[in-house]
Amino acid sequence: RSLIAAALLTPLVLRSPCRRVTAPVIGGAVCYAAFNYCFIISTKLTTSANAIMLQYTAPIYVALLSWVFLRERIRRSDLLCMAFVFGGMVLFFLDETGGGTPIGNLIAVFNGVTFAGISIFLRLQKDGNPVMSMYLGNLLSALIGLPIILSAGLPDGASLFFLLLAGGLSALTYALYARASTGLTALETVLLPIIDPVMNTVWVFLTLGERPGALSLLGAAVVLSAVTARVLSAIQP
């Protein structure tokens, strides 16, 4: 998937007038690769709910680091949004938390740190080409996973189709994410994607008919409302 994503991101990198490989570019790439593998490993060693919940502790680290490295002040609306988002996430995963191993939970916490690192390093490139970090990060992820790919053998037709689909979606989403980071604060770049696990419940319900519980619905409503209110407050003149 990462190799396909890197191939699709290549034209964006080549067409950009800014192709310098700076320290923030390398930092973003390393954090992105670490983020990919930490998430995969954490879902194997702890519950999926724990892995996702601990991953989205990233706003805490961003709130601390963005002032130090970016001099971006945390506004009251940011703090309110964070409080409601965390409350909603707790409700969302309340029935699913528990279990897993301490090392799995620890890796999931570190995954939140790497997610925060991506946000900080992309924001440091606001006057450059943050897509370069995503490009190099995908290349690094592919390089790390190359021994596993070679030992697994060639994929069948169905697996190849899903690999192409996943690679294409990954390239599209992270290209957009990198571009959006140039016009958002570091905290906003980690708060807005929290909609992702919430919407997963909606897609699973629509496609597979798996009905979410009352707490999940309440948590989803809280998260969506908090993020929407934060976005609307940011665009008001």
Labelled PLM ranges:
Residues 3, 29, 33-37, 59-64, ...:
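Hydrophobic/small/kink-forming positions within alpha-helical transmembrane segments
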Residues 14-50, 55, 91, 164-184:
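Specific transmembrane alpha-helical segments of multi-pass solute transporters/efflux pumps
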Residues 19-23, 52-55, 71-91, 98-105, ...:
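Loop-to-transmembrane alpha-helix entry segments
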